[in-house]
Amino acid sequence: VVERLRANGKRVDIISKTHVASNRAGGITADHWVRRHVINGASSCDCLWVDEISQLDVGLWLQLSKLTYTGMQFLLSGDFNQFSPKGNSFRGSMIPENAFETSGLLHTLAGGNRLELVECRRSDAELFGFYSSLITGGSRFELASLMQFAPPRSC
């Protein structure tokens, strides 16, 4: 997607919360980008790809929300069933884990669009099935069959 946007003459910036994720995507950390382009300057990109969106804390989303009226396009990716931000609070009040996932800001930034990928293409299908079953709140596997993967315990 980024290659296509750039081929069409769009300037695309890529951010993520962690160094590892931002480096893997070819970008920089969200904290650095926000300090440089929102707090201490102005962004000149046409499209901002925010990866691992569930890891960004409310402080970063407050800063990014300032860009909603600039005409900037947002490409948002992540999995809300993974890590949530640590210590995510606003004025001393903890933010519920699903607050951003169900927010109007997410809907606005995404332009009302949502694409949910449900087919595994990068790992073992059986493991993916097991992980996916945990997300929905119950394992479809019997406990005895899972115990074969547990390391032996010494008493």
Tell me what each language-model feature is.
Residues 1-155:
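Conserved ATP-binding/catalytic motifs of P-loop helicase motor domains
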